[in-house]
Amino acid sequence: MSAQTDGPYGPLIPMPELTPDALRAAVTRIAPSRVPALTQHLFEATTNAQQTQSLAPLRAFVHSWAVFVAIERHPERAARLRELERLVDAGEQDPAAAIAEIRGIRETAEAETGL
């Protein structure tokens, strides 16, 4: 895992390496309830990679879970994302601003992962 700090309220954990094992370890620490979903996704990605003889499903798995970890390791960022998703799902307001902020959160997370 690479070292990274954001001051006194920095990330819960450093950003892990972009490998299935490192991502699983990170998810176990920051969102243990999501480990079954990660395991299922990895199984499906591995099966699809074998069937299609392509690494694309495994790359998609790593991308998806790396972004998840990059968001969830920052509790304030994760809470804000969930709040924005609730606003969009509720459909009570124009979702444009919330969608733009969600996009920004995801782009920041992708940049942190190097993807």
How does the language model describe each region?
Residues 78-115:
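Amphipathic alpha-helical binding modules
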Residues 21, 33-36, 56-59, 75, ...:
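Generic alpha-helical secondary structure signal
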Residues 1-6, 111-115:
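Structured catalytic/translocation cores of nucleotide/phosphate-coupled proteins
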Residues 34-74:
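Amphipathic alpha-helical interaction modules
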Residues 18-23, 74, 90, 110-111:
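Intrinsic-disorder/low-complexity, polar/charged segments
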Residues 26, 41, 45, 61, ...:
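Charge-rich, solvent-exposed alpha-helical interaction surfaces
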Residues 2-44:
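Short terminal alpha-helical segments
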Residues 12, 16, 31, 51, ...:
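Intrinsic-disorder-associated interaction segments
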